[in-house]
Amino acid sequence: MVKVENKETLRLLTSRFMKMNRARNIIAVIAIMLTSLLFTSLFVGSVSMILSKRATEIKQFMDSAHASAQNLSEEDAKRLQETIEQSEQVERYGSGIFLGAGMDERFGFSVEVRYADENMAESFNCLPTTGRLPEKENEVALSSMILENLGVRPKIGEEITLTWEVNPMLKQYKTDTFQICGFWQGDKAVLGQMVWVSEAYAKENCYPVTEEELENGIYNGGKEYSVWYKNLWNLEKKTETISKAAGFTKAGTGMEVNPAYNLLEEDSFSFSSLIVMILFVILAGYLIIYNI
């Protein structure tokens, strides 16, 4: 390529060229601008659609963590927690225990009684906006929708009596009176409404589920974990590595990636479709500019 030292001459030649083909050059500039605008709009629109779909799935399925493990026995939970804590890929994690379903005809929706630490409650998008999570054995934090349906004032210190299912196979139930220590605005669009109890209450009253019972569909007393990695790269590989290191070798066991973050799932936005659209825009822009 010839290097032109005289910039004034270059500007003069460019100016004359523009004046000689003014109409065509103006159309070419407009075509370039429109192509750039279309490309930018396509990219921004695609990213917005992906993020919007992700936010919707996170809200609907009540899971904002990158990966999670559910329905674990005491032994499996202990082994997995040790592995998570040793992993350099993990930024933070949350833990919880599923006690059972809330039982009351006045609910009209699904209610789950659980223990959750702050990270786990955050992954469910059910952190108290008023008050705090339970610390004492007789404390409870719950959705405002539950309080409304039971006719209890949403006020810290109010007492509430709840019945929950200890074991669905044995038809075993437990009823206790709690003191409200926190609550948040319930959302009708989510899968269920949460009731958080303290760790002390959960360990004292949860069903001692066995691994065999978990395999047969009894999840009461099952332990669970939510994990956030330091970044979103290779979520499948990171999750698989932790699961295998914790001793989970069977398919469907151990940790699983949150589908909301897996953009290659069948029901998620297809990257191949995005690439095809981008190539189409580039080709169309090139042909328009070339023909001018």
Placement of each model-derived feature along the sequence:
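Hydrophobic alpha-helical transmembrane segments of multi-pass inner-membrane transport and secretion
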Residues: 20-51, 266-292
